[in-house]
């Protein structure tokens, strides 16, 4: 929960700053907790769109863990929205990708409950 996301909008070359929330069900494979942070950081380093970043994090973890049971929610401020054009300083964008067991509405609800606190 609350993994720092610091990326760059590929359209406007302005910062995207937020938090990623990641969860998985292990099928026997585990990774060090900091590896989740490193995966988020790895994909955040390049100019991005948030939707793709969210999917890339899930796919990388699915491959590393050998399970489809991975979820990622990213809540981030896009300085291209906050500082230019509409200049809405209070808005953020939320994207989500759910794989495997997280597609079940009860499992998804439980995960979203954990990250909303």
Question: Model-derived features: where do they sit?
Answer:
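A domain-level signal for the structural core that forms small-molecule/cofactor-binding pockets
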Residues: 1-117
């Amino acid at each position: 929960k609350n993994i720092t996301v610091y990326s760059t909008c590929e359209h406007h070359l302005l910062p995207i700053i937020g938090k990623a929330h990641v969860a998985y069900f292990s099928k026997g494979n585990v990774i060090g907790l900091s590896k989740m942070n490193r995966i988020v950081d790895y994909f955040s380093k390049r100019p991005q769109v948030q939707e793709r970043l969210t999917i890339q994090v899930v796919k990388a973890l699915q491959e590393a863990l050998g399970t489809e049971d991975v979820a990622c929610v990213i809540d981030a401020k896009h300085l291209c929205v906050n500082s230019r054009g509409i200049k809405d300083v209070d808005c953020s964008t939320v994207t989500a990708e759910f794989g495997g067991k997280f597609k079940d509405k009860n499992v998804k609800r439980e995960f979203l409950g954990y990250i909303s606190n």
